[in-house]
Amino acid sequence: MAEEGAQKATGKIKSVVLILSGKGGVGKSTVASQIALELANGGNKVGILDVDLCGPSIPRVLGLEDKDVHQCADGWIPVYADKNEKLAVMSIGFLLRNSKDAVVWRGPKKNAMIKQFLSDVVWGDLDYLIIDTPPGTSDEHITVAENVRGLNLTGAVMVTTPQAVALGDVRREITFCKKVGIPIVGIVENMSGYTCPNCSECTNIFSKGGGEALAQLTQVPFLGCLPLDPKLTMSIEDGKSFTELYSESPTALAIREIIRPLITS
């Protein structure tokens, strides 16, 4: 019954993609937002759902902090990030009186809110629904896994950084996905080197290649590397699409390579 309710409220969704990370601070929401923006730039109808209830970042990275969600007879109407209404957004950040308020909830209340997000948002028909999840593995992840089974789940994109501690956490995330039956689209290594804003040369300030090595070890596809790019940071601060502003940059090309399996799946 929950699955039927989700389909009725959300409309037809062709592909659901989860964005996961084993730990916080690896740029998961940045990757989620850039995937959603690039898919929308390609003419797709895209929704992005922020279920990181205690740390909602999507309104900030898309420049939508001052927006409000409205209700209709069928549920919540999402916020649109563009005039053409190609990118719809839903986050608990839109429901807080003050965007800086802390969400201090126990597990059952968080799970109830996630279920409501997955059943009561009036997306309309979507080509893609990108779900930005909290870091780690918790009750919230189990709730998401249980409630997307009735939808067209393409799988999960894992976001990590090159450091060993982040890679270890992602390995546990991969185990979680296998246990709950979530297909894995692949691994993205974020913050993989620093791109100079003047000459575009990439310098490895952390270790490099850990994400690809982990992908080989766990037999999971490796989707590519994203460097620390000051221009990407600036575009996020302005709530703009990086791939539109810097379409020929190495980072933009890397983002397009990352979404290729989502388009062809």
UniProtKB/Swiss-Prot annotation:
This is Cytosolic Fe-S cluster assembly factor NUBP2 homolog. Belongs to the Mrp/NBP35 ATP-binding proteins family. NUBP2/CFD1 subfamily. [4Fe-4S] cluster binds at residues 196, 199. Component of the cytosolic iron-sulfur (Fe/S) protein assembly (CIA) machinery. Required for maturation of extramitochondrial Fe-S proteins. The NUBP1-NUBP2 heterotetramer forms a Fe-S scaffold complex, mediating the de novo assembly of an Fe-S cluster and its transfer to target apoproteins. One of its GO terms (cellular component) is cytosol. It comes from the Eukaryota. Its cofactor is [4Fe-4S] cluster. InterPro entries: Mrp-like_CS, Mrp/NBP35_ATP-bd, NUBP2/Cfd1_eukaryotes, P-loop_NTPase, YlxH/NBP35. Keywords: 4Fe-4S, ATP-binding, Cytoplasm, Iron, Iron-sulfur, Metal-binding, Nucleotide-binding. It is found in: Cytoplasm. Heterotetramer of 2 NUBP1 and 2 NUBP2 chains. One of its GO terms (biological process) is iron-sulfur cluster assembly.
